[in-house]
Regions:
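Enriched but not universal
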Residues: 1-11, 17-19, 148-158
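Short beta-strand-plus-loop segments that form exposed binding edges in beta-rich domains
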Residues: 129-136
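Short glycine/proline/serine/threonine-rich loop/turn segments at secondary-structure transition edges
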Residues: 61-62, 116-125
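Short, surface-exposed beta-strand/strand-loop-strand elements in extracellular ectodomains
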Residues: 78-89
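Extracellular beta-rich ligand/substrate-recognition surface
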Residues: 33-50, 135
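A short beta-strand element within beta-rich, extracytoplasmic domains
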Residues: 48-75, 128
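Extracellular carbohydrate recognition and processing domains
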Residues: 92-119
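Edge beta-strands of jelly-roll/beta-sandwich modules across compartments, strongly enriched
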Residues: 136-145
Length: 158
């Protein structure tokens, strides 16, 4: 059975992000990325990052199969996102230049290297961040961190 974790806080301010859809907040729960509700999402057209802390998960006891996932939609041609993983304020993984399609929500994922996963020493202090490379509008319906046999979720919408 996968381990499912919801966000417990926003790191910094979420004021630059609009909440779209009934009852949408940065920290509410959502469906799994495999069956998302794209009617509720957050959006930003300033190139601002959003960083959210995940509920402390159990250690997955392995350094393979750890993936950052995002379901988002862009509004510009050539728009890219960066997906980042932090332990506290220390960067663990930074994957920029992920091209996204304009106009419709799609799933994007990046597997974290074994070396990056091995550098995690405190699974109770993990944050996920997404940011657009441009000031084109970025809509995000789900962020999650998935372990091969456990899923650690951070949802940004409902």
């Amino acid at each position: 059975m996968p381990q499912i974790k919801a966000p417990i806080s926003v790191s910094g301010s979420d004021a630059a992000w609009s909440k779209n859809g009934a009852g949408t907040t940065i920290l509410c729960t959502s469906d799994h990325i495999a069956s998302p509700d794209d009617g509720t999402y957050i959006s930003n057209s300033g190139g601002d990052a959003i960083r959210v802390k995940i509920d402390p998960p159990d250690h997955p006891n392995k350094t393979t199969g750890l993936k950052m996932k995002c379901r988002c939609s862009g509004s510009g041609i050539g728009q890219e996102i960066a997906l980042r993983l932090f332990q506290g304020s220390t960067g663990i993984a930074d994957y920029g230049s992920i091209s996204i399609a304009p106009g419709s929500f799609e799933d994007y994922e990046q597997e974290i290297s074994e070396g990056e996963a091995a550098s995690i020493t405190d699974y109770s202090d993990l944050y996920l961040e997404v940011q657009s490379s441009t000031t084109d509008q970025l809509d995000v319906s789900v962020l999650e961190l998935e372990a091969a046999d456990r899923i650690l979720r951070v949802y940004v919408t409902t």
